[in-house]
Swiss-Prot record:
Site (Reactive bond for chymotrypsin): L38, N39
Keyword Repeat applies: yes
Keywords: Antibiotic, Antimicrobial, Disulfide bond, Fungicide, Protease inhibitor, Repeat, Serine protease inhibitor
Cross-referenced Pfam families: Prot_inhib_II
Similarity field: Belongs to the protease inhibitor I20 (potato type II proteinase inhibitor) family.
InterPro entries: Prot_inh_I20, Protease_inhibitor_I20
Organism: Solanum tuberosum
Entry annotated with the keyword Repeat: yes
Function noted in UniProt: Inhibitor of serine proteases chymotrypsin, papain and trypsin. Has strong antifungal activity against C.albicans and R.solani. Has antibacterial activity against the Gram-positive bacterium C.michiganense, but lacks antibacterial activity against the Gram-positive bacterium S.aureus. Lacks hemolytic activity against human erythrocytes.
Protein name: Potamin-1
GO molecular function: serine-type endopeptidase inhibitor activity
Residue pairs linked by disulfide bridges in the UniProt entry: C3-C40, C6-C24, C7-C36
GO biological process, one term: defense response to fungus
Lineage: Eukaryota, Viridiplantae, Streptophyta, Embryophyta, Tracheophyta
Amino acid sequence: DICTNCCAGTKGCNTTSANGAFICEGQSDPKKPKACPLNCDPHIAYA
């Protein structure tokens, strides 16, 4: 399992659940990372 959340995901990269449902797009710019909580969103299976 991966451990990520919408905030920590990379901008432009979508996260999906185990059945392929779209959850969110990442919000963190690799050049200017956001300060994100390190919690795992249990719904996110792929990023």
